[in-house]
Amino acid sequence: MVVLAYQYFKKQKPQGITVPVDSLVVIIGLIAFSVIPLLVNGTRDFSVITMYVKELILFIFGVGLYNAFYANVNGQQKVVRDLQLGVVVQFAVGVIGLLGASFMIDFLLSTNAVLPARFYGSEQEYRLYNITATAFFQLSLFYLMLLHFLLAYNAKHNTLPSILVFLMLCIGLISGRTFLLLSVVSILVYFKWRYVPSLIAFAVLVLLLAYFLPENPYVAHALEPVINLLHGEGFVSSSTDT
């Protein structure tokens, strides 16, 4: 934001500052609508409002970053490059967290919105091993849109490494089952034969986890449908409905 302010006052931004007003209005609207359940139910659970406020703050910083560093001729290429870097970083920290490194788990949980205590230490905690202020369903949709964007970009430019598909599927799986189910649509729409090794690697990983570690609480929740297919119907996690 400081860099952007400097560029603006030095008149290095003759085209002005781009602000996606529609997206800004949507986030503010979500904050406003989140107040209604509090008023109706008389509760003091501000976790949802806190999440959207964090999103608003991050969105504003994101707009600032875009205008400061990406609003130029090569901006699109730079955005895609940094998104790829972000995917690699998220994959790395997510795996470290899943392996049980306490320092990484503490760091990842600190980046999330504050959620009800029942989620911490539960079979769903793995879904919080993401560097984000968003939780669960919204996070799955975010990763879904990110996958769709990167695949669409690659369909046109064909410059992204195929391993990126594997990494995206892995971090998307951490976010929840919504991503796992809906990502199939994006992959089918923008399918390339060179994605096949990454897709096979991911499928093998999922099958191995579901077959050999069905009792692991994180695996049981994330891969419940696959476990049911492999081990027979009737196996359910304690949080199937969520």
Residue positions per predicted region:
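Hydrophobic cores of alpha-helical transmembrane segments in multi-pass inner/ER membrane proteins
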Residues: 2-4, 57-67, 140-150
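Juxtamembrane membrane-water interface segments that cap and precede transmembrane helices
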Residues: 114-131, 241-242
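Aromatic-anchored transmembrane helix interface
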Residues: 23-34, 44-68, 82, 87
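Membrane-interface loop/short-helix elements at transmembrane-helix boundaries
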Residues: 124, 221-242
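Alpha-helical transmembrane segments of multi-pass inner-membrane proteins
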Residues: 80-108, 129-175, 180-192
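Hydrophobic alpha-helical membrane-interfacial segments at the cytosolic entry of transmembrane helices
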Residues: 25-29, 82-92, 194-216
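Transmembrane signal-anchor hairpin modules in multi-pass inner-membrane enzymes, especially those
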Residues: 1-36, 74-81, 153-157
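Transmembrane helix-loop junctions and nearby membrane-interface residues
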Residues: 5-12, 35-42, 95-105
